[in-house]
């Protein structure tokens, strides 16, 4: 009994002693599993954008993925990743790596994805990738590679995609990809490659996509690719290719897309260029220097469902007719911006419209071009006159170099004029609608001002009606009026003698001026006779005739003149007696 108790005490004592050691070991392993400044998600370690110049040494041995992107690493040392046996992917892009040791990737045989893009690597040793034979994806793009070793990718038999984009490669060694039998994507775009050897792609029996765009190829020979029996997409846009040829009789049945846009292709070397690609579905020939395409080439495009031909220098002559006829019968996708570049009269006109409107493909004998002056469409404003019916005559022989305009042009002009009429009527309707809307809004927002406008308009109408009624009431006969303007001599004689000669003018106008009734002040301070309007311009009343008004006015004027003369004579006598009294 006592021995059992002692044993239990001893066991508990051992446990108490070992517990701190176990805890310290666990803490140290935890600290080693996630380095300082990094982010750990399970067995994935992300040490990104930390300006690291060295790879942390405290990374857990069970790490499956390590990302060291956007740091300042400059080189990879010998056995740099020793101890990371479980690592399956490694991201080292966007660093300053310029030197990689030949044995830097020792000990990570399970690695499947290696990203070294956007660094400063200028070369690789032949044995650099030998320890990572299980690679599936290798990205070496955006570096400064000038050349590749002949055994650079030896042993990478499981590689599926290889990216060498945006480097400075000028040549590709022969059979460099011979061990890459499972490679499906090869990207050699944006380099300085001028030519390729025939055995460059030897062994690549499963390649499906090949990028050779933005290089310096001057010609393309489809005989370079007979070993690429599984290739489906070939990208060779934006090179300097001017000629496409085929020097080998073989059938490339796997190719489905060919991109040759942005080159300098002027013509095809022979009618059998595209006969070796019977299953071609998508062809890009835009932005080249093609002027026409022969009927033999068009006949070889038997399986196309998408074509791009814009941006070429198409010559709209009879040579273009075969292409236009083919485009009209083509049922796939195509661009409608196929524009004429010559002759000068048709620059900027759509090729199909030019052939349709100007009868380029009409019957002609010797010349190919058409006479533009005879082929111009008729103006829309010219009226159509009925054609007289003549007796049937034998047809005249066609003139050389001229074609009769097609009747389709008249139909087009009729459609254009009809559309203009519709557009004008719609514009007129919209303008009227806007005016009504403005009036309605102003009526709702400013009702007082609208009422004032209505009252003013009613007053104007009332005045207008009143004037018309007065005009109807005035007599139509013309009356004569006397205009009397006395002179200075006549005035003095009238003052002294009481009578004197006078002159007056007789006129037949309704608007006249007569002198006012004269009094003493008028004669004493006389500069110009004061005038007033006659009574003709007063409104005529229906119960009072004009003659009575005139008689009353004359009687009043006579009375006023008699009074004035009496006052003048009395004033003269008083002035005569004054000197005598003096």
UniProtKB/Swiss-Prot annotation:
Tissues in which the UniProt entry reports expression: Expressed in neuronal tissues.
Residue ranges constituting the LRRCT domain according to the UniProt record: 312-363
Transmembrane portions of the chain: 421-441
Membrane topology: Single-pass type I membrane protein
Signal peptide: 1-30
Side of membrane Extracellular, spans: 31-420
Spans of repeat LRR: 63-83, 86-107, 110-131, 134-155, 158-179, 182-203, 206-226, 230-251, 254-275, 279-300
Coiled-coil portions: none
Residues of this chain annotated as glycosylated in UniProt: 126, 357
Highest taxon listed in the record's lineage: Eukaryota
Chief site of localization: membrane
Topology, Cytoplasmic side: 442-582
Residue ranges of domain LRRNT in the record: 31-61
Family annotation (SUPFAM superfamilies): L domain-like
GO biological process assignments: positive regulation of amyloid-beta formation; positive regulation of synapse assembly; regulation of presynapse assembly
Annotated region (Disordered), positions in chain: 378-410
UniProt keywords, alphabetically: Cell membrane, Glycoprotein, Leucine-rich repeat, Membrane, Postsynaptic cell membrane, Repeat, Signal, Synapse, Transmembrane, Transmembrane helix
Subcellular location(s) of the protein: Cell membrane; Postsynaptic cell membrane
Family the entry assigns: Belongs to the LRRTM family.
Role description: May play a role in the development and maintenance of the vertebrate nervous system. Exhibits a limited synaptogenic activity in vitro, restricted to excitatory presynaptic differentiation.
Protein name, per record: Leucine-rich repeat transmembrane neuronal protein 3
């Amino acid at each position: 009994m006592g021995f059992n108790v002692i044993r239990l005490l001893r066991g508990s004592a051992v446990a108490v002693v070992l517990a701190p050691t176990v805890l310290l070991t666990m803490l140290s392993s935890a600290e080693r599993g996630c380095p300082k400044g990094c982010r750990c998600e399970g067995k994935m370690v992300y040490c990104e954008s930390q300006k690291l110049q060295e790879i942390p040494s405290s990374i857990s041995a069970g790490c499956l993925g390590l990302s060291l992107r956007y740091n300042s690493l400059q080189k990879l040392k010998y056995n740099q990743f020793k101890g990371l046996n479980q690592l399956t992917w490694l991201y080292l892009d966007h660093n300053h790596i310029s030197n990689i040791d030949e044995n830097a990737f020792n000990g990570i045989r399970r690695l499947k994805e290696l990203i070294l893009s956007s660094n400063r690597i200028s070369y690789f040793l032949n044995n650099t990738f030998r320890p990572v034979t299980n690679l599936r994806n290798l990205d070496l793009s955006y570096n400064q590679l000038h050349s590749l070793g002949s055994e650079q990718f030896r042993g990478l038999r499981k590689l599926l995609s290889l990216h060498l984009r945006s480097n400075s490669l000028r040549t590709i060694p022969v059979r460099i990809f011979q061990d890459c039998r499972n490679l499906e994507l090869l990207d050699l775009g944006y380099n300085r490659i001028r030519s390729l050897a025939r055995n460059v792609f030897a062994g690549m029996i499963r390649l499906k996509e090949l990028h050779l765009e933005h290089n310096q190829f001057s010609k393309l020979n489809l005989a370079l690719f007979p070993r690429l029996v599984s290739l489906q997409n070939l990208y060779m846009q934006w090179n300097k290719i001017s000629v496409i040829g085929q020097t080998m009789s073989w059938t490339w049945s796997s190719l489905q897309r060919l991109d040759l846009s942005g080159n300098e292709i002027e013509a095809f070397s022979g009618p059998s260029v595209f006969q070796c690609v019977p299953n071609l579905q998508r062809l890009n020939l835009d932005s080249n220097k093609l002027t026409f395409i022969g009927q033999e080439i068009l006949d070889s495009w038997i399986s196309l469902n998408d074509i791009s031909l814009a941006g070429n220098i198409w010559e709209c002559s009879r040579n273009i007719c075969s292409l236009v006829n083919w485009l009209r019968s083509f049922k796939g996708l195509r661009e409608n911006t196929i524009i004429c570049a010559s002759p000068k009269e048709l620059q900027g006109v759509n090729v199909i419209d030019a052939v349709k409107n100007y009868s380029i493909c009409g019957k002609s004998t010797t010349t190919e071009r058409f006479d533009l002056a005879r082929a111009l469409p008729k103006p829309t404003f010219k009226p159509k006159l009925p054609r007289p019916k003549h007796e049937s005559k034998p047809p005249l022989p066609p003139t050389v170099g001229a074609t009769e305009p097609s009747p389709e042009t008249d139909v087009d002009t009729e459609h254009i004029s009809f559309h203009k009429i519709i557009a004008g009527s719609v514009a007129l309707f919209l303008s009227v609608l806007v005016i009504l809307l403005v009036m309605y809004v102003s009526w709702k927002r400013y009702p007082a001002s609208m009422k004032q406008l209505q009252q003013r308009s009613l007053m104007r109408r009332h005045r207008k009606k009143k004037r018309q009624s007065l005009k109807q009431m005035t007599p139509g006969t013309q009356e004569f009026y006397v205009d009397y303007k006395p002179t200075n001599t006549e005035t003095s004689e009238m003052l002294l003698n009481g009578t004197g000669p006078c002159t007056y003018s007789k006129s037949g106008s309704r608007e006249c001026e007569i002198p006012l009734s004269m009094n003493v002040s008028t004669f004493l301070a006389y500069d110009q006779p004061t005038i007033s309007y006659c009574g003709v311009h007063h409104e005529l009343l229906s119960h009072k005739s004009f003659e009575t008004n005139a008689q009353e006015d004359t009687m009043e004027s006579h009375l006023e003149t008699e009074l004035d003369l009496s006052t003048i004579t009395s004033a003269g006598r008083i002035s005569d007696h004054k000197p005598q009294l003096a």
